[in-house]
């Protein structure tokens, strides 16, 4: 296993070990009410209690998050490329998006519920709306600030603007696009949980809310860990795809080890 992977997974194992030891010490010394800080064993037991509903919760939440993320990714990359490569599109579209972008996405959640109801559509569109902006901004910046010398050289040698875009602008913007996709994925899960906490009868966020009503902190932590693990897996998949697409890009010193 590469050295960096050992360090990464070792840090996670160390954090879990510290949590476990602190829980054991706290149970003996009663520094804090043990019900408020369950141990990893308590959390695993809570997950086992929910074993019959967890698969469905994961499937429902994943479907919502991925549907919203897919919409955001398509629109964000397309509009980012359009505004980054066209001054007219930039002048017309970008000011409107920049006006909306500073508003916290959750401020629109009540509006989306009124417009689209409490069903799946409002949650999926809310996720798409929240993830769109980070994807758009990163794509726009990557395309807009592609190497101007290479662009001028390509155009002076007779390349069309379309060809220059696909051979220079888009490849050079790919790292920024993937940065936006990773941030968008994180935003998707953030808004997903918030939406499920407020207006859902299934999903991982709803299960956390149900645990709050029951004052089951062990189940609440289990739900949070569950979301973190799924997010980590999805981020790793995105990182793997990015590494394959950017195999041509020089790596930083020591990155491959």
Please give the residue ranges for each predicted region.
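Generic hydrophobic transmembrane alpha-helix motif, especially the helices
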Residues: 98-134, 141-142
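Transmembrane alpha-helices
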Residues: 125, 129, 161-195, 222, ...
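N-terminal signal-anchor transmembrane alpha helix
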Residues: 2-28
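C-terminal transmembrane helix and the adjacent membrane-cytosol boundary/short C-terminal tail
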Residues: 87, 175, 179, 221-257
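Periplasmic/extracellular loop-to-transmembrane helix junction in inner-membrane transport proteins
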Residues: 2, 25-73
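Glycine-rich helix-loop "coupling/hinge" segments at transmembrane-helix boundaries
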Residues: 114, 143, 190-227, 246-256
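Transmembrane-helix boundary motif in ABC transporter permease subunits
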Residues: 68-97
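Short cytoplasmic-facing helical segments at TM-TM junctions of multi-pass membrane proteins
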Residues: 142-183, 204, 208
């Amino acid at each position: 296993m590469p050295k960096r992977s050992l360090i990464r997974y070792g840090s996670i194992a160390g954090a879990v070990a510290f949590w476990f030891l602190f829980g054991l010490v706290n149970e003996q010394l009663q520094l804090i009410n043990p019900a408020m800080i369950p141990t990893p064993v308590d959390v695993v037991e809570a997950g086992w209690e929910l074993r019959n509903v967890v698969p469905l919760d994961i499937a429902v939440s994943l479907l919502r998050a991925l549907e919203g993320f897919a919409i955001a990714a398509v629109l964000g990359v397309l509009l980012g490329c359009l505004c980054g490569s066209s001054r007219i599109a930039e002048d017309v579209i970008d000011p409107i998006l920049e006006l909306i972008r500073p508003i916290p996405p959750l401020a629109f959640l009540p509006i989306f519920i009124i417009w689209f109801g409490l069903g799946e559509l409002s949650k999926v569109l809310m996720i798409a709306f929240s993830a769109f902006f980070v994807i758009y901004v990163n794509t726009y910046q990557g395309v807009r600030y592609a190497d101007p010398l290479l662009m001028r050289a390509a155009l002076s040698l007779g390349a069309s603007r379309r060809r220059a875009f696909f051979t220079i602008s888009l490849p050079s913007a790919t790292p920024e696009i993937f940065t936006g996709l990773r941030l968008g994925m994180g935003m998707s899960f953030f808004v997903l949980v918030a939406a499920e906490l407020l207006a859902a009868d299934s999903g991982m966020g709803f299960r956390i809310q149900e645990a709050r009503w029951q004052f089951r902190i062990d189940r609440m932590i289990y739900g949070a860990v569950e979301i973190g693990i799924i997010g980590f897996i999805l981020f790793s998949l995105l990182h793997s795809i990015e590494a394959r697409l950017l195999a041509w890009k020089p790596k930083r010193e020591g990155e491959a080890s």
